[in-house]
Every structure is written in C-alpha cells, then in structure tokens.
Amino acid sequence: MLSGYRVFSRRYVKSFPCLSRGFEIETELTIHALELRMKYGEVNTKYGERSEGSVSKLSTWSDGFKILKTIIKLYSLERPLYFFSIIGVLLAALSIILGLPIIVDYIDTGLVRRFPTAFLTASIMLSSIMAFVCGIILHSNTTTRREMKALFYLSEKNYKLIM
C-alpha cells in the first residue's frame, strides 16, 4: 500500500477525486481502487541505495500520524454508518452508566437528587441517537456517491496497453 511508486490507467486518473495532499494520498489512492473493485497488479522494480549525502524527507511519527488521521477521515467518509454507530454506542453506554444510579436512587426514594447529572445523561443519550441518525443519513449519501463514482469510472473509455 505504501510503496510510493504507482502507475495508473487513464480511467483511474479520470475517476479519482484527489482530496489529500502529501504523503497521505497513498492511502486515498488504495481505497479508491478497492472501492471501485479495480484490477491492480504489482511490478517488481530494482531499488538502489540512497545517494551519499542525500537526506530522507520521511518522518516516522509525523507521517504515521498523517496517515492515521487520513485513515480515520476516510473511514468516516466511506463507512459512516459503522463510524457513527460506534460513536452512538459509546455515548449510549456512557449515558446508561451515568443514569443507572439516578434511576436506582429514584426508585428507592422517589426523588431525583442529582438533577444536573440527570440532565447530562439525557443530553448524552440524545447525542447518541443523533449520531445513529447521522450515520444512517450519511450512509445513504455515501452509497449514492459510490454509485456515481462507479458510473463515471465505467463511462470513461478503456484504452488498451500496447507493448
């Protein structure tokens, strides 16, 4: 995935919406190819030693964080239902954890003694529901976008490679 050397068909280039800049574009290139179920192959190439006196522009930590950020961003764009469902489940669990003692206290005494926590719990649960709804809406948008991308890819003329 992170080879740094790529060859693309004309169809691929015409259908690829480049959204990233820099090192993280490699992740986006791979996801685009996988999303449209494009054929891909590997070509063995010879690599040589780095010239003496030259310095690598790669930085392990900063480039790694850029790629991780891009993966999270692309995951939220490509799989919004799963992404927002995870957020919704975490928020719902937090709401239940905070709300159970209040409910138990209410059943025992008939009073809500920690009203601010009850309000916070209700707000977190509403946020959880909103995350699920956003995931459903964005999932339908993503499905439509994928279909449009696939149609655009297929509408591009496929040129034969002459060797």
UniProtKB/Swiss-Prot annotation:
It comes from the Bacteria. PANTHER family: RFBJ PROTEIN (PTHR48090:SF7), UNDECAPRENYL-PHOSPHATE 4-DEOXY-4-FORMAMIDO-L-ARABINOSE TRANSFERASE-RELATED (PTHR48090). This is Uncharacterized protein SF2094/S2216. It comes from Shigella flexneri. The lineage of its organism: Bacteria, Pseudomonadati, Pseudomonadota, Gammaproteobacteria, Enterobacterales.
